[in-house]
């Protein structure tokens, strides 16, 4: 999913809630693109557009999907309601854990899939001719801490003129 920026075209999708139709959009891009297409997508967005996996399997496009699976709505852990809603209610209303096995879901739709357990596994998935799904499992609380550390490092660098 990487490479020199000059060799990559970037597309984005903005559904009604920001997560609608991301896979369908990627299928459209892959239909008109002569090379491989990669999409990085969250687990909840994948659930919202999972029927597109069946459409993808029927088309045989070289679309490589990386699902970041933190078992729910991780974005909400970065927003103010995380600190004002009691933890049990927060998890029910915002965390929305689903317990979905995305590799199994992709396989059920006729796609090849793998769960990445290392960076090398992610690289193998990214290099697998599609349609292919690679799932990376993450932890929401650790993600928040990592984002906080990155934001601090950037703020410190900007403040110090680095």
Which sequence ranges carry the predicted segments?
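Thiamine diphosphate
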Residues: 2-162
